[in-house]
Amino acid sequence: MKHIRNFSIIAHIDHGKSTLSDRLIQVCGGLTDREMDSQVLDSMDLERERGITIKAQSVTLDYKAKDGQVYQLNFIDTPGHVDFSYEVSRSLAACEGALLVVDAGQGVEAQTLANCYTALDMNLDVVPILNKIDLPQADPERVAAEIEDIVGIDAMDAVRCSAKTGVGVDEVLEVIVAKIPPPEGDPDAPLQALIIDSWFDNYLGVVSLVRIKHGSLKKGDKFKVMSTGQNHTADRVGIFTPKQTDKTELKTGEVGFVIAGLKEIHGAPVGDTLTLAKNGADKPLPGFKKVKPQVYAGVFPISTDEYENFRDALNKLSLNDASLFFEPESSSALGFGFRIGYLGLLHMEIVQERLEREYNLELITTAPTVVYEVVMTNGETIYVDNPSDLPAINNIEEMREPIVEANILVPKEYLGNVITLCIEKRGTQVNMVYHGNQVAVTYHLPMAEVVMDFFDRLKSTSRGYASLEYNFIRFDPADMVRLDILINGDRVDALAMVIHRSNIRHRGLALVEKMKELIPRQMFDIAIQAAVGSQIIARSTVKALRKDVTAKCYGGDVSRKKKLLNKQKEGKKRMKQVGNVEVPQEAFLAVLKLNE
């Protein structure tokens, strides 16, 4: 056990986490050069394309150190993006230490800070590493000072390396062995193993990645999942080197996989504890908070016969993604679908893209909303995540919207732009600290504004230098109203949205204008209106197509023409009473893209 080191890498997006892990694998000979592929651990196509890490992965490497001993390094990859901070806290729970990788050109960013504090809260040893020193703009001295100043850990003798060229990678391995403590645990105690992650394999069933805290798990052992109380047999146990390699047992302190032929993912929920069926442990391991979805959206299959496939796809995906929440929903405009809860907008995009890609579904998503706390006139409090569930205005005593605390790190030349953006988003400034060239600003912002397009706008006003990290703090009373879209006097439930009263004019106008371009002309006029309660605030009309009924009249008897025109008018009026308008898919998407 003295020779085991469990660690993960914390870094901001694009600071070279995945490249560094490739180098570590290469140096330790986990894969032959032919199998070496860049970003080995980002196994999803989507991860590769966007260049981000989404799922936590693990690798076990054998490293022969300079002192002649062979160490077993268990390395758990973590995502860097704010929406996946939950995946990070899980990965950290399985480690004794973390490498804090910072880009020597860019310096510390908000994300890194947040994850680093998570690690320090869990009493992990954090080892700073300066990456990308091969770049011309690298300034390791300044960045080391920045780490000490902002994060508050000693960084003067931090290892300097370049994962791309391979410089300094050996030093990184030596530092891991020297600075990260070996696991503590009792090999003779009853088994306690933490499930770090589980995913579904079409051939093997559920594969769980576990960290053995106490005891050991052998192939063929009967074990019990503590939250469900069900017993299973371990058909296979082993490690990833990154390839799956079977072993006979996993010992205390090791990280590896267990396959027990489970058919359904919820049989081994992430963050749960495994113990032996006979004389097992009494209490589960600490270290997991159920994560709450922050953003909800309705998702519907474009053709209704895809509904079953869609449900299966969601079930499979939720095996893989512990933070996904969904429940059935039906809409008069879009048919049957699901209301899905996400951690944030990036999570939402990725889930939707994975559904469309991996399961060949065609989906349509309604505008994302956050959860509102509504106090009714009869004194009860309800939580609403769907605009069409909102009670009538006269039954609402007060509406409260979720407020987040956003920590933004930004170079000082862009500070003005960022403050302007935060004010426009109805934010209140809480704190501002200068660290050398960077400024750390703290704002309280309404979550609804943050989930819409805040991140993109923040990046564009600061030329990509600002970084953001946010968490929910409380509900605050706010003047929120529901904006309905009426088409020929009928409410379209899928287009309703909850917005602040100060935005309704501007938003309503933009919406009806946009809808006017997208709804095809019919044989009668279509009125598109935006309404709040019973008050109409904007309207536009899609004009009718008409046939030239007077074309066949020679000569000019005006009463004949009038008769024909009046007859046409009558017909249009009748049509309007019975006709119904198909709202095309593009119109729903337009609502989402309104901000751009």
From Swiss-Prot:
GO cellular component, one term: plasma membrane
Membrane topology, as annotated: Peripheral membrane protein
GO MF, one annotated term: ribosome binding
InterPro entries per UniProt: EF-4, EFG_III/V, EFG_V-like, EFTu-like_2, G_TR_CS, LepA_C_sf, LepA_CTD, LepA_IV
Reaction equation(s) it catalyzes: GTP + H2O = GDP + phosphate + H(+)
Keyword Protein biosynthesis listed: yes
Domain of life: Bacteria
Residue ranges occupied by any tr-type G domain in the UniProt entry: 2-184
UniProt xrefs under Pfam families: EFG_C (PF00679), GTP_EFTU (PF00009), GTP_EFTU_D2 (PF03144), LepA_C (PF06421)
EC nos: 3.6.5.n1
Gene Ontology BP term (one): positive regulation of translation
Location(s) in or outside the cell: Cell inner membrane
Ligand binding (GTP): D14, H15, G16, K17, S18, T19, N131, K132, I133, D134
Keywords from the named record: Cell inner membrane, Cell membrane, GTP-binding, Hydrolase, Membrane, Nucleotide-binding, Protein biosynthesis
Entry similarity comment: Belongs to the TRAFAC class translation factor GTPase superfamily. Classic translation factor GTPase family. LepA subfamily.
Function: Required for accurate and efficient protein synthesis under certain stress conditions. May act as a fidelity factor of the translation reaction, by catalyzing a one-codon backward translocation of tRNAs on improperly translocated ribosomes. Back-translocation proceeds from a post-translocation (POST) complex to a pre-translocation (PRE) complex, thus giving elongation factor G a second chance to translocate the tRNAs correctly. Binds to ribosomes in a GTP-dependent manner.
NCBIfam families referenced in this protein's UniProt entry, alphabetically: lepA, small_GTP
Protein name stated in the entry: Elongation factor 4
